[in-house]
Amino acid sequence: MSIASDKLVKECEEKMVKTIEAVKEKFTAIRAGRANVSMLDGIKVENYGSEVPLNQIGTVSAPEARLLVIDPWDKTLISKIEKAILAANIGMTPNNDGRVIRLVLPELTADRRKEYVKLAKNEAENGKIAIRNIRKDINNHLKKLEKDKENPISEDELKKEETNVQTLTDKYVKEIDDLLAKKEKEITTI
């Protein structure tokens, strides 16, 4: 067993895990029918001359299925938070009562749900492509190791490691499929 080939297979798994995390992050950004505090993650608010993430200047909660509440720690920032939400164009209009900001999620139409499912499928496919590209790169590195003059690996070891890489590929592609099925159900559930 070659240390170099083991290292490549470990590197392969690490990259695939990072790809899965990226797909999960993309899925979080796709809105389902329920309010989720992560829907506001990308919003930055101007605070004392710098852009600060919304979740760092107040508490963001989802007390109901279609309601987000932002409770800023500094109440003087309410108008700036409102402006940032409107500028982010997230499809919600902020309601300000002077203490907190409420965001009511509009009901998703059937067409909008289909769009979100399509978007989720696209992100899942991009994740699978990334996983397969990682497999291809690692297999190419393994083949170079087989031809290495100083420290070659045997043909049997090459086949064994390629099988390990394929097993990892299958595992993570299935995980993406499972994540997609879960996200589709979340989007289509009314």
UniProtKB/Swiss-Prot annotation:
GO terms for molecular function: ribosomal large subunit binding. SUPFAM superfamilies: Ribosome recycling factor, RRF. Gene3D superfamilies: 3.30.1360.40, Ribosome-recycling factor. Its main location: cytoplasm. InterPro entries: Ribosome_recyc_fac (IPR002661), Ribosome_recyc_fac_dom (IPR023584), RRF_sf (IPR036191). It comes from the Bacteria. One of its GO terms (cellular component) is cytoplasm. Keywords: Cytoplasm, Protein biosynthesis. Pfam families: RRF (PF01765). It is found in: Cytoplasm. GO terms for biological process: translation; translational termination. Belongs to the RRF family. Responsible for the release of ribosomes from messenger RNA at the termination of protein biosynthesis. May increase the efficiency of translation by recycling ribosomes from one round of translation to another. PANTHER family: MITOCHONDRIAL RIBOSOME RECYCLING FACTOR PSEUDO 1, RIBOSOME RECYCLING FACTOR. This is Ribosome-recycling factor. It comes from Fusobacterium nucleatum subsp. nucleatum (strain ATCC 25586 / DSM 15643 / BCRC 10681 / CIP 101130 / JCM 8532 / KCTC 2640 / LMG 13131 / VPI 4355). The lineage of its organism: Bacteria, Fusobacteriati, Fusobacteriota, Fusobacteriia, Fusobacteriales.
